[in-house]
Amino acid sequence: MKNIIASLLLASSALVSVNASDPVMIGRRGCGYAVENTAEAYHEGARRGFTMMEAHVRATADSVFVTSHDGKTDRLGGHMKIAASTIADLRSETYSQQRDSATYSGSTICTVGEFLDICKEKGVAPLLHLKTFSKDTKDCGHLSPLVGLIREKGMEGSCVILTSEPDYIEYLMATHPDIRLQYQADAKWQEMFEWSTARGLDVQIRADLVDADCVRRYHDAGVKVNVWTVNTPDEYSRLSNLGVDYMVTDYLCPESL
């Protein structure tokens, strides 16, 4: 499978014309060449040329922000629930993951602070993808401490916060208006179009839901479109020709396009 992906990447230059309007490629969970959402994935993503990388954000029982897509660590070989575990507990686990034909192992949990440090060192813009911190989405108590961490690391100028929760958006716009935001609209993009464009929010939409009319409407409203997940040259070509502004990918590294 990895050989097939490599062949597709090499062929992509023949399928896609490179120009000034090329989308920003975002390394999904770092990149697809290490255990997802770990320091190794972020270092490898930066090495492969990503100028923006995504990290999913959750909070531990002792209020440390960590990078993890799932609320539990079992998919990566752990056995803990992040919200019920301390950072010290989570540090005791070692993670592994099979991605296509390769198996990656030996990684441990990464904190958001560490992710931001890597981004700052490598000159990469961080995309912090918030997972829901509480069943009550009006409980926004974690958001100001997260913004405080972003400021502490000196990354407020380049960091983007992505969330599907309108309550989080409203809170952040009211309390931290300088922080850049994206709204994850997906299948709700038409339903939420007026709400998001009235706030000048860039949007993220799943790739199969994006067509020319979708991109045109958002661009006419003066906002940008981010699509996920784009892992083939054909899909890259289709979406690039539509004029999308960002693409989230595991494998389509900028150095290969």
Question: What spans do the regions from the language model cover?
Answer:
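Bacterial Sec-dependent N-terminal signal peptides
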Residues: 1-23
